[in-house]
Curated annotation (Swiss-Prot):
Protein name: Glycogen synthase
Catalytic activity: [(1->4)-alpha-D-glucosyl](n) + ADP-alpha-D-glucose = [(1->4)-alpha-D-glucosyl](n+1) + ADP + H(+)
Job of this protein: Synthesizes alpha-1,4-glucan chains using ADP-glucose.
EC numbers on record: 2.4.1.21
NCBIfam families: glgA (TIGR02095), PRK00654.1-2 (NF001899)
Pathway involvement of the protein, from the record: Glycan biosynthesis; glycogen biosynthesis
UniProt GO molecular function: alpha-1,4-glucan glucosyltransferase (ADP-glucose donor) activity; alpha-1,4-glucan glucosyltransferase (UDP-glucose donor) activity
Keywords assigned by UniProt, alphabetized: Glycogen biosynthesis, Glycosyltransferase, Transferase
Length: 481
């Protein structure tokens, strides 16, 4: 089976969040099941530096304002099509914004070009390659499905995966004339969205199937609270809506072999976590004692509930727990957390930024990870926590609710608990969960049971890939029918 994946980022080449981890791991997991997935990505500088020998398999004399070409390459074990369009992608800063973090004003043009290329490939533009299914990820790739709908690949089955509905790619109506779509597309059942153009909306409208990254989130986005203005359309498409929990790359995230750890360990050698714990204490300036270390590895944003954390942080310290915080985001939240660290020297440590190696060390050395998101489509850090015996303490929402079994009395008695859950958007509930964690930590045998049960959980891509494969087969059967 030949599947074309279209995405703005892919690990290990370009990553701003969990999307890259998913798009990098899924092709590998599917390959083991007989699926050949090739991935179309933009030619950002970090991507173009990854390969020297360039073989153009398709040329554009003009694509959204300049010359462009598609290259077929293999990098890091991935089969890629790279859209080389220097006028759109060869820029300093991040993939979506400049060095100051402001969005590029022509993002609509940049990702319309990516989507046009995806639809062209689906329509047979590259000699000798014709995908049977096209799988688009998030708003930056969603227009691929609209271009397919109004072009040569209208009969090719397509899937739209929503990793976070909050990011929709909404633009003014004035751009429509430059998208290269027929006038009929600027309609309610096309790309029109509240008087403008909605990239994600267009993908949701055109897709043969829609997936989100957890069953709970698939249900949540049907409500006005989580639907972000798209709940009406999503309810209309509900018979084509599926929730599939992400997996993680268990070769990269393996405490037994992880080179980022000071000390490797397994579920039967948890005491070997101690040197990692010491490394966390040193890096974050924490007191050396026997109290639990709770970590935060997150974007510091409203969605992630970091403002709620900031309001109860003094109470968390009062429970006896220590905090190690790694992340960046809202300047006000960064300041509030740094101020808390200054108030509670030795009890709170904060590192502003993101450090992949440090995140591994934290999972391998901290006792718990708190994830207080207001909404969380899937979440990956709690899966890393399970894998590393870093007990997840999570808000009961989205994929967090689907992947963590709360350590209530019944779950503890049955030996199935893997973490703690609390009501989202509630500082008091978060604080109560931390108190429960501290109490559990005071009983080493019970706490290690939770750790080991989490480490036994299957968080690999195998089950998730099987569910995607089932959906691909369903879509192909619809095409034949």
């Amino acid at each position: 089976m030949q599947v074309l994946s279209v995405t703005p980022e892919i690990f290990p080449l370009i990553k701003t969040g969990g999307l890259a981890d998913v798009t990098g791991a899924l092709p590998v997991a599917l390959a083991a099941k007989g699926v050949t997935m090739r991935t179309l990505i933009p030619g950002f500088p970090a991507v173009m530096e990854g390969f020297k020998k360039r073989k153009a398999v398709y040329q554009y004399p003009l694509l959204q304002g300049g010359k462009a070409s598609i290259h077929a390459v293999q990098i890091a074990g991935l089969d890629l099509f790279v859209l080389d369009a220097p006028h759109l992608f060869d820029r300093p800063g991040g993939p979506y914004g400049n060095a100051s973090g402001a969005d590029w004003p022509d993002n609509w043009r940049r990702f319309a070009a990516l989507s046009q290329a995806g639809a062209d490939i689906a329509g047979g533009a590259i000699s000798g390659y014709l995908p049977e299914i096209v799988h688009a990820h998030d708003w930056q790739s969603a227009m691929t499905l609209a271009y397919m709908r109004y072009g040569k690949a209208v009969g090719t089955p397509s899937m739209m995966t929503v990793h976070n509905l909050a990011f929709q790619g909404q633009f003014g109506a004035g751009i429509f004339g430059e998208l290269g779509l027929p006038a009929v597309a600027m309609a309610l059942d096309g790309v029109e969205y509240y008087g403008g153009v909605g990239f994600l909306k267009a993908g949701l409208q055109a897709a043969w199937a829609i997936t989100t990254v957890s069953p709970t989130y698939a249900q949540e986005i049907r409500s006005p609270e989580f639907g972000m203005g798209l709940d009406g359309l999503i309810n209309m498409r509900s018979s084509d809506l599926y929730g599939i929990v992400n997996g993680i790359d268990t070769a990269i995230w393996d405490p037994e072999t992880d080179k980022h750890l000071v000390s490797n360990y397994t579920a039967t050698t948890l005491k070997a976590r101690a040197p990692n714990r010491a490394a966390v204490e040193e890096r974050f300036g924490l007191d050396r004692d026997d109290s639990p270390i709770v970590c935060v590895i997150s974007r510091l944003t409203w969605q992630k509930g970091m403002d709620i954390l900031a309001t109860v942080i003094d109470g968390i310290v009062a429970t006896g727990a220590r905090l190690a915080i790694l992340g960046s985001g809202d300047a006000g939240l960064e300041g509030a957390l740094l101020a808390a660290a200054a108030r509670h020297r030795g009890r709170i440590g904060v590192v502003i930024g993101y450090d992949e190696g440090l995140s591994h060390t934290m999972q391998g050395g901290c006792d718990a990870i708190i994830i207080p998101s207001r909404f969380e489509p899937c979440g990956l850090t709690q899966l890393y926590g399970l894998r590393y015996g870093c007990v997840p303490v999570v808000a009961r929402t989205g994929g967090l609710a689907d992947t963590i079994i709360d350590a209530n009395e019944a779950a503890m008695a049955a030996g199935v608990a893997t973490g703690l859950q609390f009501a989202p958007n509630n500082g008091g509930a978060m604080l109560h969960a931390i108190r429960r964690l501290v109490d559990a930590y005071a009983d080493p045998a019970a706490f290690e049971t939770i750790q080991r049960q989490g480490m036994k959980a299957d968080v690999s891509w195998d089950k998730s890939a099987e569910k995607y494969l089932e959906l691909y087969r369903l879509l192909l059967s619809k095409r034949v029918a």
